[in-house]
From Swiss-Prot:
Interacts with NGL1. Glycans are attached at N133, N320, N406, N433. It comes from Homo sapiens. This is Netrin-G1. It comes from the Eukaryota. Its main location: membrane. Disulfide bonds join C33-C50, C72-C92, C80-C88, C182-C206, C297-C306, C299-C315, C317-C326, C329-C354, C364-C373, C366-C384, C387-C396, C399-C417, C420-C432, C422-C438, C440-C449, C452-C462, C467-C480, C474-C486, C488-C497. Residues 208-214 are annotated as: NGL discriminant loop II. Residues 1-28 form the signal peptide. The laminin N-terminal domain mediates 1:1 binding to NGL ligand with sub-micromolar affinity. Three NGL-binding loops mediate discrimination for LRRC4C/NGL1 among other NGLs by binding specifically to its LRR repeats. This specificity drives the sorting of a mixed population of molecules into discrete cell surface subdomains. Keywords: Cell membrane, Developmental protein, Differentiation, Disulfide bond, Glycoprotein, GPI-anchor, Laminin EGF-like domain, Lipoprotein, Membrane, Neurogenesis, Repeat, Signal.
Length: 539
């Protein structure tokens, strides 16, 4: 019973989690513009596509209202609650902070009680239209990564248009129309994002989904970014490679999610009835408590950092690019036409770095050790060619094998690299470390591997001692010659002269011993001698 209850609770938790987290938290790993790799030429840079993290872009915008004096409170006025036209004791006064509703309250911290919001003047000049343009400007190209969400403190407007600009507000194009009656307001058939497809995802639609009359729980308007992404990446955005492929190859799709400015055009406030109640015009106004815009600086996949300085956003460009959006090659790096980075292949993409111009390579940043460079397309990098003065590496900044860095010389000094001079007999190879120490064979020591460790002697390299005057003594009168062999008397042989020569010939007991000493151990010989010289015993 307990097991089945646990499984039921677990299944419920999985279901709730999937509902609460419909999209992946991480969309792609493009957080590095370059990394170092090792090649035969030493360490070189490997470049990859990169982009800044998605963030709350409302922190960096400037807001402008048109007409400029449309905000309530100057002069002070009272307004009615829309749900109850007889509750007209709410006051807006721009000179009193507690009663003021300036535009910046659309972007402040949410969750306060009571809530903060911007509010327009009431529709006291009816039948003249009450219309407001709210322009959000970044002075920078940004890419939208999440839904645009507008939360109204009052009822949602009966008519509204969300517009975008790609040229800093010089021209505008509609993003989406909102109305209680699309056909009447904009001569368009009502649609929702669910009616679109991959082929019609760029269609500008009018929706009635968010423009119903005032209700307590119906204050939010969306512009659905993620639902449009889902046409390519799937309903849970798992197939990001498909979306990235479309963004790479379809400029119109990429531009659709790119803006420099947004404009909210409020054309008709929430009326709540068919006709406007001219006796209670103080109940008609616009009030917005929050606007959410999430995205990232557009850096054309050439930067991971976007700096906000002096009220301006700027990409910190990599890949030898420059410009506010990294949209051109740096001076002297026009070796091929500028190109944006590419998301593909997943997961690192393609950097499409700018390369040096042939006429501007100069000394190729080779510290004076070469005047030639070569571009390696596979690595998207430029390396020095034919490094002189025993140097090597991408910028001739390393020493060739068999040489080490002269710590007292600058990188551009001809004597920056010193030969290792490893002893060929004592070292494993001719290379040394950064301090000039060679790698020695067993029994060998010294910076150049030309000295022997104790117990070893030099003989075409260090060899273990065969004999010495300390532990490995030559026996039977033998003498040690240069620690490499014992010089034995004529009757003895062996490494330490420890064997009788006749033992090897097998003739120690024959008459032809030629004066060989009697066969036997030293103890037996001593006993025989003692017995031969002793006096006879008397009984």
């Amino acid at each position: 019973m307990y097991l089945s209850r646990f499984l039921s609770i677990h299944a419920l938790w999985v279901t709730v989690s999937s509902v609460m987290q419909p999209y992946p938290l991480v969309w792609g790993h493009y957080d590095l513009c370059k990394t170092q790799i090792y090649t035969e030429e030493g360490k070189v840079w490997d470049y990859m596509a990169c982009q800044p993290e998605s963030t709350d872009m409302t922190k960096y915008l400037k807001v402008k209202l048109d007409p400029p004096d449309i905000t309530c409170g100057d002069p002070p006025e009272t307004f009615c609650a829309m749900g109850n036209p007889y509750m007209c004791n709410n006051e807006c006064d721009a000179s009193t902070p507690e009663l003021a509703h300036p535009p910046e309250l659309m972007f402040d911290f949410e969750g306060r009680h009571p809530s903060t919001f911007w509010q327009s003047a009431t529709w006291k000049e009816y039948p003249k239209p009450l219309q407001v343009n709210i322009t959000l400007s970044w002075s920078k190209t940004i890419e939208l990564t999440d839904n645009i969400v507008i939360t109204f403190e009052s009822g949602r407007p009966d008519q509204m248009i969300l517009e975008k600009s790609l040229d800093y507000g010089r021209t505008w194009q509609p993003y989406q129309y909102y109305a209680t009656d699309c056909l009447d307001a904009f001569h368009m058939d009502p649609k929702s994002v669910k009616d679109l497809s991959q082929h019609t995802v760029l269609e500008i639609i009018c929706t009635e989904e968010y423009s119903t009359g005032y209700t307590t729980n119906s204050k939010i308007i969306h512009f659905e970014i993620k639902d449009r992404f889902a046409f390519f990446a799937g309903p849970r955005l798992r197939n990001m490679a498909s979306l990235y492929g479309q963004l790479d190859t379809t400029k119109k799709l990429r531009d659709f999610f790119t803006v420099t400015d947004l404009r909210i055009r409020l054309l008709r406030p929430a009326v709540g009835e068919i006709f406007v109640d001219e006796l209670h015009l103080a109940r008609y106004f616009y009030a917005i408590s929050d606007i959410k815009v999430r995205g990232r600086c557009k850096c054309n996949l050439h930067a991971t950092v976007c700096v906000y300085d002096n009220s301006k956003l700027t990409c910190e460009c990599e890949h030898n690019t420059t410009g506010p959006d990294c949209g051109k090659c740096k001076k002297n790096y026009q070796g091929r036409p500028w190109s944006p980075g590419s998301y593909l292949p997943i997961p690192k993409g393609t950097a499409n770095t700018c390369i040096p111009s042939i006429s501007s390579i100069g000394n190729c940043e080779c510290f004076g050790h070469s005047n030639r460079c070569s571009y390696i397309d596979l690595l998207n990098t430029v390396i020095c060619v034919s490094c002189k003065h025993n140097t090597r590496g991408q910028h001739c900044e390393l020493c060739r094998l068999g040489y080490f860095r002269n710590a007292s010389a600058q990188l551009d000094d001809e004597n920056v690299c010193i030969e290792c001079y490893c002893n060929p007999l004592g070292s494993i190879h001719d290379r040394c470390n950064g301090s000039g120490f060679c790698e020695c064979k067993t029994g060998t020591t010294g910076p150049k591997c030309d000295e022997c460790l104790p117990g070893n002697s030099w003989h075409y390299g260090c060899q273990p001692n065969v004999c010495d005057n300390e532990l490995l003594h030559c026996q039977n009168g033998g003498t040690c010659h240069n620690n490499v062999r014992c010089l034995c008397p004529a009757a003895y042989t062996g490494i330490l002269c420890e064997k009788l020569r006749c033992e090897e010939a097998g003739s120690c007991g024959s008459d032809s011993g030629q004066g060989a000493p009697p066969h036997g151990s030293p103890a037996l010989l001593l006993l025989t001698t003692l017995l031969g010289t002793a006096s006879p015993l008397v009984f």
